[in-house]
């Protein structure tokens, strides 16, 4: 048993100065769906006296901008490290875990392009009848947050490839431009002819716009410039260790060439992206 103090929490919730946004938990009173007994337990639990702290969620702190910021830590959730391709049940668990974490602990959920209430039914359908791998669907769901800090650290090689043309590029408006020579070494007898200012027009006979559309839904960024910067990094990736064809334009003349690729190290990813890739 636990002590409840409903008057304490109702008073807090009634103050407009405390909460700018409130989570709708009216569903706990839905006796038709939940049954009367479960509904009553949830209503009672809502007002439970939590003087000893929350048994499900704790706070962890990290240093940012010279101050310590709290983050929720979901101690009671099992990680399931060994599930590389989980079944239907675990896929749905992923959806509900992530959606609820955002629903109850993410203050910027009201700023996403898509209504967060629409995300849950959409990804229940996606995970129940997946059109892509578990990894692809998970990254797509995370990208719905439109937040640079919401990143799935693993799987970038599975989605976009471990090999990459060693060339730094960035978008100038909607054109992909060679920015600087790459600092990543590559062993090759074929020297790519690119110069700063060259426009990349197509990769493997597919226009740059094709890759922009393909990668956009997997990239979580808060503004268009960062989306384009992340896209610039993915366009020159491939899953095969072989030269790839690139069409580029210089001084109004379009040329075709083959460019060698290099294998990215295991840690290679977003840190490199934000350090070297710029969008103008």
Predicted features, each with a name:
Residues 1-280:
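Flexible, low-complexity junctional segments that flank or bridge functional domains
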């Amino acid at each position: 048993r636990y002590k409840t103090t409903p008057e304490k929490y109702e008073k807090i919730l009634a103050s407009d100065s405390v909460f700018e946004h409130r989570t709708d938990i009216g569903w706990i009173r839905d006796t038709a769906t939940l049954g009367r007994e479960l509904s009553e337990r949830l209503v009672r639990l809502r007002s439970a006296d939590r003087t000893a702290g929350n048994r499900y969620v704790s706070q962890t702190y990290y240093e940012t901008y010279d101050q310590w910021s709290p983050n929720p830590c979901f101690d009671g959730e099992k990680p399931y490290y060994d599930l590389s391709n989980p079944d239907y049940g675990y896929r749905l668990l992923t959806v509900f875990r992530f959606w609820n974490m955002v629903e109850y602990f993410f203050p910027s959920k009201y700023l996403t392009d898509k209504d967060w209430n629409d995300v849950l039914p959409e990804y229940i359908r996606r995970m129940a009848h997946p059109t892509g791998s578990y990894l692809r669907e998970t990254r797509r769901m995370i990208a719905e947050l439109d937040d640079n800090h919401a990143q799935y650290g693993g799987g970038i090689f599975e989605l976009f490839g471990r090999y990459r043309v060693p060339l730094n590029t960035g978008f100038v408006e909607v054109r992909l431009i060679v920015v600087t020579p790459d600092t990543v070494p590559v062993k090759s007898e074929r020297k790519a002819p690119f110069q700063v200012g060259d426009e990349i027009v197509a990769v493997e006979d597919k226009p740059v716009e094709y890759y922009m559309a393909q990668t956009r839904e997997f990239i979580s960024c808060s503004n268009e410039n960062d989306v384009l910067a992340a896209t610039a990094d993915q366009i020159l990736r491939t899953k095969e260790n072989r030269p790839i064809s690139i069409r580029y334009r210089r001084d109004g003349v379009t040329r075709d060439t083959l460019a060698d690729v290099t294998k990215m190290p295991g840690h290679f990813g977003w840190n490199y992206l934000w350090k070297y890739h710029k969008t103008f």
